[in-house]
C-alpha cells in the first residue's frame, strides 16, 4: 500500500499537468501524510519506515522519486512544503528539520516552502491569529461540532499573529541551503514582503490576504511600502474551510447572527 500511495503522487503530477499547471507542491508538512511519516510524534513504526530519521524519510523520498520522474517528463517545476518545526514537544524541531531540508535539496527539487505547525496537534501554529471556535464548529459535522464547542478552548493552543511570524526561523534554513526557498507566514504588507525578499528568499506565498482581496498583488505593485492588506486575521475564512467554500468574513453580509456576534467580540 505504501508503494502504491507513492506511485499515486506521481500520477497526481500528470493530473496537474493535464489541468494546465506548470508547477506542483508536494505537501510534506502540517501533519498530513508525509509529515506523519517524518514526525517522531506520529511515526511509531518499527520497520524500515520508522525509528531513525533516514527511515522516517524513506516515504518522502519514495514520493519525490515518483513526482520528480513525472515532472521531468512533463517539464514541470516541483516545490516541497516542509515543516521547520511541528510546534510541540515530541515533534520535529529545527535541528532535525534542517537535516531533512538538506536531504530534500539533494533530491533536485526546484525549491522548498518553509512552514510550521501540525493540524491535529498545533493547528494555529500554522497560521496564527484568533480562533473563532463557534464559527469553526458551525461548519463541522454535528458530532465534531459538539466536541469543538465543549473542549476546543482547552485543546487548541493560541498563537498571536504578528507580521512575518516564521521569518526568524526561516532565516536559519536560508543560511544552510543553496536552493531557492519560498517564504510563507504572516505576509500582509509590501514592507513585510520586501523584508522577506531582502532576507534572501526568492519567492513568497500568501493566502488570507488574497482571500480578503484577490487584487492585493496588483495593489502591491501599484502602491508603496505602506500598502497593507485589510485582513484582520479573525480566521473566519479558515473556519469556513469545512464548508468547502472559503470566503472572507468582510465579504459575507449574510452571516448567521451568532457568527456575527462572535466575530464582533474578537479583538
Regions found by a protein language model. Name each.
Residues 1-267:
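Flavin-dependent oxidoreductase catalytic cores
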Amino acid at each position: 500500500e505504501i508503494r502504491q500511495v507513492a506511485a499515486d503522487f506521481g500520477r497526481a503530477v500528470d493530473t496537474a499537468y493535464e489541468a494546465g499547471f506548470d508547477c506542483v507542491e508536494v505537501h510534506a508538512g502540517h501533519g498530513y501524510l508525509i509529515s506523519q511519516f517524518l514526525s517522531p510524534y506520529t511515526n511509531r513504526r518499527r520497520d524500515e519506515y520508522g525509528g531513525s530519521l533516514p527511515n522516517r524519510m524513506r516515504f518522502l523520498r519514495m514520493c519525490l522519486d515518483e513526482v520528480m520522474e513525472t515532472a521531468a517528463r512533463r517539464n514541470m517545476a516541483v516545490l516541497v512544503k516542509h515543516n521547520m518545526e511541528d510546534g510541540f514537544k515530541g515533534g520535529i524541531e529545527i535541528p532535525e528539520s534542517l537535516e531533512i531540508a538538506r536531504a530534500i535539496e539533494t533530491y533536485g527539487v526546484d525549491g522548498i516552502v518553509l512552514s510550521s505547525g501540525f493540524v491535529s496537534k498545533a493547528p494555529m501554529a500554522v497560521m496564527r491569529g484568533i480562533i473563532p471556535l463557534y464559527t469553526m464548529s458551525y461548519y463541522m459535522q454535528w458530532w465534531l461540532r459538539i466536541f469543538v464547542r465543549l473542549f476546543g478552548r482547552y485543546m487548541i493552543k493560541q498563537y498571536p499573529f504578528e507580521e512575518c511570524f516564521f521569518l526568524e526561523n526561516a532565516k536559519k534554513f536560508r543560511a544552510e541551503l543553496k536552493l531557492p526557498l519560498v517564504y510563507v507566514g504572516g505576509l500582509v504588507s509590501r514592507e513585510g514582503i520586501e523584508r522577506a525578499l531582502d532576507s534572501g528568499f526568492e519567492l513568497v506565498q500568501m493566502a488570507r490576504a488574497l482571500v480578503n482581496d484577490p487584487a492585493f498583488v496588483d495593489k502591491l505593485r501599484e502602491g508603496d511600502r505602506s500598502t497593507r492588506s485589510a485582513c484582520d486575521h479573525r480566521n473566519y475564512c479558515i473556519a469556513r474551510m469545512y464548508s468547502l467554500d472559503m470566503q472572507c468574513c468582510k465579504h459575507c453580509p449574510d452571516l448567521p447572527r451568532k457568527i456575527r456576534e462572535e466575530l464582533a467580540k474578537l479583538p
